[in-house]
């Protein structure tokens, strides 16, 4: 407000000087003497003392005193007329400037904007208005705040990830991480070894035995989870024995049949040497259940076991 009043006062001062110069230039214009143009307003100030108003040469010679009085009165009226004209012009201009300044002060001062009413179109990038998520060229009211408004987003600290964050104590790390100091006074945050199911991790080595580090659905984080295995069942194609369900006694074998292309399928085995790849026989948990289409192989050991049972009673 102080700046507006100061600029208005300086403007009024310049207008006053301009009107005075304009009046002087108008008076000093070359006009014909009185009697030729018809009014005394065309007389220049330099001719005022040498001219008389209303007297001819003979009367001026007879009455020198009266001629001087008339000259002085005419000059006074002449000067008063143009002075009054300049004052009127100055008053009109001053009133106009005051009216303009008074209308300029009706604005509302606020932080962050140059408007005095809420308009949804000005905040279309925040979800308001009819544009929705439409991205258009940013206008005057959608530009980011700078230091000229008194606020700035540059002063906000950058978010440092939990992994490999510099630390001196475990409290400086995220939950589930510890501060490991190898050399020097400053260490780095690392995940604990042997993380349980659901805890954050970075590699499979960070998890306990039997768990693997996998991405969480719907986020960018990784946590220790139970490995999802889809062991193949009987007569399903495979590449190595690790793909078959070993708990049911299946391994991957090369199957050859008459007039058919050889293929690798999961099948029951008796000797691990017929399987493709290593087989952990100690993981077989269930009794082998043969199907009706399989060839039943009768173990000789069972007959021997039966004979051994009958021997004492013979």
From Swiss-Prot:
<feature type="transmembrane region" description="Helical">
    <location>
        <begin position="90"/>
        <end position="112"/>
    </location>
</feature>
<keyword id="KW-0812">Transmembrane</keyword>
<keyword id="KW-0472">Membrane</keyword>
<keyword id="KW-0165">Cleavage on pair of basic residues</keyword>
<dbReference type="GO" id="GO:0016020">
    <property type="term" value="C:membrane"/>
</dbReference>
<feature type="signal peptide">
    <location>
        <begin position="1"/>
        <end position="19"/>
    </location>
</feature>
<keyword id="KW-1133">Transmembrane helix</keyword>
<keyword id="KW-0732">Signal</keyword>
<protein>
    <recommendedName>
        <fullName>Prohormone-3</fullName>
    </recommendedName>
</protein>
């Amino acid at each position: 407000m102080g700046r507006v009043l100061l600029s208005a006062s300086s403007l009024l001062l310049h207008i006053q000087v301009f009107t005075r110069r304009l009046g002087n230039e108008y008076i000093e214009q070359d006009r014909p003497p009185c009697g030729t143009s018809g009014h005394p307003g065309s007389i220049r100030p330099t001719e005022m003392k040498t001219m008389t108003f209303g007297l001819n040469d003979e009367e001026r010679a007879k009455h020198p005193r009266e001629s001087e009085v008339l000259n002085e009165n005419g000059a006074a009226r002449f000067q008063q007329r143009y002075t009054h004209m300049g004052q009127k012009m100055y008053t009109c201009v001053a009133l106009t400037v005051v009216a303009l300044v008074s209308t300029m002060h009706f604005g509302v001062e606020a932080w962050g904007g140059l408007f005095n009413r809420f308009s949804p179109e000005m905040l279309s990038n925040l979800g308001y208005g009819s544009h929705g998520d439409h991205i258009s060229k940013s206008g005057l009211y959608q530009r980011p705040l700078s230091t000229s408004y008194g606020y700035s987003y540059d002063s906000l600290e950058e978010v440092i990830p939990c992994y490999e964050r510099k630390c001196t104590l475990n409290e400086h790390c995220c939950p589930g991480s510890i501060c490991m100091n190898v050399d020097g006074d400053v260490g780095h945050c690392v995940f604990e070894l042997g993380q349980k199911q659901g805890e954050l991790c970075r590699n499979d080595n960070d998890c306990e035995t039997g768990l693997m580090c996998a991405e969480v659905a719907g986020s960018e984080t990784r946590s220790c989870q139970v490995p999802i295995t889809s062991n193949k069942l009987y007569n399903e194609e495979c590449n190595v024995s690790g793909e078959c369900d070993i708990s049911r006694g299946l391994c991957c074998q090369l199957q050859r049949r008459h007039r058919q292309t050889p293929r690798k399928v999961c099948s029951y085995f008796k000797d691990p040497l017929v399987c493709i790849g290593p087989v952990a026989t100690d993981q077989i948990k269930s009794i082998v259940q043969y199907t009706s289409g399989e060839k039943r192989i009768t173990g000789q050991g069972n007959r021997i076991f039966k004979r051994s049972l009958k021997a004492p009673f013979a």
